[in-house]
């Protein structure tokens, strides 16, 4: 598949034209990515996990190049320090929490890992998964039996990102929340405030809302910041009568390249109407 000189050695392609041969250069396709971001799904025992199927079916229909779960797939309500000692804490079990989280991920993946479709999978550990690691720190005698390292995420095909370590995909940083380096706590404020603070495009979860900010840069490009922290189909009693009135859904980023993408937001209400059995 090439030209040889009189000694039998290959002639470099850049010399072919001088010998009267033309070479058709292979164009490298610079295709922007399509990325689906699954917000916090917070699977727990005794709730329906059908919403994971709806999300998975949508992913299969749209076939993004990358699927990012932004964290808090496992609720780990048995490890909540806020509820300990309350009546609502009665009956919670770690084993049931793990089983619910594992089942939710199986339901999600089963809907789109088929027919040759195999997107890149990225999982950003959330603060709810961090509860499991905190237990391992507090009870070192259980090392190897507890902690996120015992969850089957990697075996399921996910690239697992440590809690609060951002991952850069085409110039956009994905992480459960943006942490203030002085305190380790989440940055507050709107998506625009956070975008101005960190100076890079980002997608985060954690906060039960939908907030998006876009701003131009001096080089003629754009940056984007997205907060989308809920993709579960149940209400949380602790949030009260109005606290549950927030957006629930996922995000699809189209034409992702050079730190920007065009967002589309898909509500669980829409997914339920389209895919509910």
Give the label of every model feature segment.
Residues 43-155:
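Core catalytic region of metal-dependent phosphoesterases/phosphodiesterases
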Residues 1-38, 42-45:
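Acidic, histidine-bearing metal-coordination/catalytic regions of metal-dependent phosphoesterases
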């Amino acid at each position: 598949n090439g030209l040889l000189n009189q000694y039998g050695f290959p002639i470099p392609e850049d010399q072919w034209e001088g010998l009267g041969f033309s070479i058709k250069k292979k164009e490298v396709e610079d295709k922007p990515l399509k990325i689906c971001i699954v917000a916090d799904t917070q699977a727990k025992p005794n709730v329906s996990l059908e919403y994971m199927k709806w999300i998975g079916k949508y992913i299969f229909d749209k076939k993004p190049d990358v699927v990012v779960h932004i964290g808090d797939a496992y609720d780990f309500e048995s490890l909540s320090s806020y509820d300990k000692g309350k009546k609502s804490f009665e009956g919670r079990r770690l084993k049931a929490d793990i089983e619910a989280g594992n089942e939710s991920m199986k339901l999600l993946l089963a809907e789109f890992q088929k027919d040759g479709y195999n997107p890149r999978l990225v999982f950003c550990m959330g603060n709810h998964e961090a509860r499991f690691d905190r237990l391992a720190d507090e009870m070192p005698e259980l090392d190897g039996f507890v902690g996120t390292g015992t969850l089957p995420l990697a075996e399921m095909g996910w690239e697992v990102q440590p809690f609060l370590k951002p991952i850069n995909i085409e110039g956009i940083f994905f992480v459960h929340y943006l942490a203030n380096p002085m305190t380790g706590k989440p940055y507050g404020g709107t998506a625009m405030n956070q975008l101005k603070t960190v100076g890079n495009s980002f997608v985060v979860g954690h906060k039960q809302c939908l907030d998006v900010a876009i701003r131009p840069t001096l080089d003629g490009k754009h940056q984007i910041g997205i907060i989308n922290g809920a993709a579960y189909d149940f209400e949380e009693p602790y949030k009260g009568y109005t606290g549950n009135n927030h957006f629930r859904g996922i995000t699809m980023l189209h034409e992702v390249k050079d730190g920007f993408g065009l967002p589309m937001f898909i509500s669980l209400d829409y997914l339920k109407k389209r895919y509910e059995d």
